[in-house]
């Protein structure tokens, strides 16, 4: 093989390697920054250390502000897995449907008990994450997201319910 042919082959191999490396690095960033982001909830009524059983922002004067903060917090911390606007791509649970079973109940006491159970499940999952067989399916956000931030995200998801 001539010197020119050898140099050409080396350049092609080098360019191919660089292309593959560039593409693989783009793939690793496909879901964006994976570092969880804290959320500024200073404009919301503070809830204290004890975790509440029900979403204090579902109704009332803080609802609109909680919705604004929750939408931003969701997009920063949840959308990479659960989808933009809470529309899942099929890999992670579709959070628009988290309390669908509750909304269909006619008995008000059963409906309230169902919402209570969903709230407990939601908060526990966000705080502690979910793992099975040594695999992390959802990272824990305890110490990163405050109670106010988590309830704000839940407020946002309540407006995204699929009916």
PLM feature spans:
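Bacterial N-terminal signal peptides that target proteins for export
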Residues: 2-16
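Hydrophobic alpha-helical targeting segments used for export or membrane insertion
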Residues: 17-22
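N-terminal signal peptide c-region/cleavage motif recognized by signal peptidases
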Residues: 25-27
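Axial heme c-ligation environment in periplasmic c-type cytochrome domains
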Residues: 30-39, 89-98, 125-161
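Electrostatic cytochrome c docking/interface patches
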Residues: 35-73
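Gly/Gly-Pro-rich "capping" loops immediately C-terminal to redox-active cysteine motifs
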Residues: 67-71, 83, 87-127, 137
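The canonical Cys-X-X-Cys-His
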Residues: 70, 74-84, 138, 153-157
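Short sequence/structural segments immediately N-terminal
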Residues: 73, 162-163
């Amino acid at each position: 093989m001539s010197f020119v042919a050898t140099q050409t082959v080396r350049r092609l191999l080098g360019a191919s390697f660089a292309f593959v490396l560039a593409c693989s690095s783009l793939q690793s960033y496909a879901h964006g920054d994976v570092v969880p982001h804290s959320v500024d909830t200073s404009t919301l009524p503070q809830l204290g250390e004890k975790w509440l059983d029900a979403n204090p922002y579902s109704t009332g004067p803080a609802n609109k502000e909680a919705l604004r903060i929750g939408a931003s917090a969701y997009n920063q911390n949840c959308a990479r897995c659960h989808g933009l606007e809470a529309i899942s791509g099929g890999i992670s649970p579709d959070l628009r449907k988290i309390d669908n079973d509750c909304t269909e109940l006619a008995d008000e006491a059963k409906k309230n008990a169902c919402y209570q159970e969903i709230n407990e499940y939601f908060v526990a999952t966000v705080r502690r994450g979910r793992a099975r067989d040594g695999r992390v399916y959802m990272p824990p956000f305890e110490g990163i997201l405050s109670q106010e931030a988590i309830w704000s995200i839940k407020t946002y998801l309540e407006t995204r319910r699929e009916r």
